Amino acid sequence: MTVRLQLALDFVDLHRALKAAEEGVRGGVDVLEVGTPLLKAEGLDAVRKLRQAFPRIDIVCDGKTMDAGRLELETAAKAGATVGTVLGLASDSTIEECCEAGRNYGIKVLVDLLGCPDPAARARFAASVGAWAVNVHCPIDEQVRGGDPLEALRAVRAAVSIPVTVAGGITARSAPAVVAAGADIVIVGGAITKARDAETAARSILEAMRSGVAGDSEMAERISSEDELRRILTEVSTPNISDAMHRAPCWSGLHALVPGIRIAGPAVTVRTAPGDWAKPVEAIDHCKPGDVLVIDSGGVPPAIWGELASNSARNRGLAGVVILGAVRDTANIRTLGLPVYARTICPNAGEPKGFGEIGVSLRVDGISCQPGDWVVADDDGVAVLPRARSVEIANRAMYCLEAENRVRSEINDGGQTLAEVVDLYKWEKQVISQEDPE
């Protein structure tokens, strides 16, 4: 069986899905998938419209059926799908019913092993009741925590002889590995649908699949450990991070003394009184290269930081300094090039009395910063990533950036407005009326 490329259209707007499908098919995509978000947003009309646009191509209706298998497979088949999906977590009877309905209505059944405790065992059951194929699936919410499908793919491939599909953050870089592990169909979503040029991205992935040589991708590699955090966090912005954290607030209203620079590093925290610069300066000695010094001095003058402290911090190799308080000597600090972000600027400092603490929990404007949390600062503000979730948040922020890149290309290429591209009017929240019915 020649390895095939399936494009997962995980949009919520049909017009965007159709555009990506057109580009993908031009790039050599073999199978189109109506992704679950698209199916929920647009219904089976998405299958019908794709069938009209692509009458000769296989179409997967990714309904992820858990119940009512006969009805869901019947309607998918009548809408034009050639493959319907049922979750491996569904009951045995539901999977069996889907397979019987598939035989009756002429639609192939793909059992998605997403979340199955023993994927290989469930794959064997699926094959025994007549499923056409099984899907080894590492979902987005696991990918952002460093998961990948390779281990499960090898186990499932060894367990069954029916076709095995694979999904889970696959790009031109990783496609050869999943083919080598036994995938018959490689399912790709974001690496194509978020690419500025989906046609070129699809072609690159196909070449990598069939040549066995990893290719290039504009999608960033997802990270799996804290060791890789700095690389990805200096590529995303604080707005991307806020979006990734469900629009979480960041520290704003700070002056970036060296504009145009983005910094990222683990926090060394200080709390001090306004104007008391003893603990902030002493904290430099506690820092390692790449750390970000975060100082809470109440957000008001007098200054607790200046040029001499900045010289020390630069020599120590700090990534930067965030001052929730006042700074002075700003012209000289700019000359040094040390990234410093401060809430206010004033010429007068206080005395170094030592009324403060180093390595403490900070909470400013409702935002918590613990020692070791990751801090990202740029011209827009300062974001704090809890250390325990920093890898996940960084990956989600990159996902947000890549999605924005695709929207930008659609705006520029098609001459549309943002509201038109994302169908903003349709997605305004509908609320319960407070008016009494007449």
Q: Where do the protein language model's features map onto the residues?
A:
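Conserved anion-binding
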Residues: 5, 68-153, 158-159
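Active-site/ligand-binding-proximal alpha/beta "capping" segment
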Residues: 132-187, 191-193, 363-398
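Short, small-residue-enriched loops and turns at beta-alpha junctions
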Residues: 11-16, 36-42, 65-68, 90-93, ...
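Alpha-helix-loop-beta-strand connector modules within alpha/beta enzyme cores
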Residues: 43-64, 98-115, 147-170, 204-218, ...
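C-terminal helical cap(s) of enzyme catalytic domains, especially alpha/beta-barrels
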Residues: 98, 179-181, 190-218, 397
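Hydrophobic faces of well-ordered beta-strands that scaffold small-molecule active sites
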Residues: 3-9, 32-34, 59-63, 84-86, ...
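Feature captures the catalytic cores and cofactor-binding loops of soluble hydro-lyases/lyases
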Residues: 217-371, 384-438
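Conserved N-terminal beta1-alpha1 strand-loop-helix module at the mouth
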Residues: 1-70, 119, 126-129, 235-240, ...
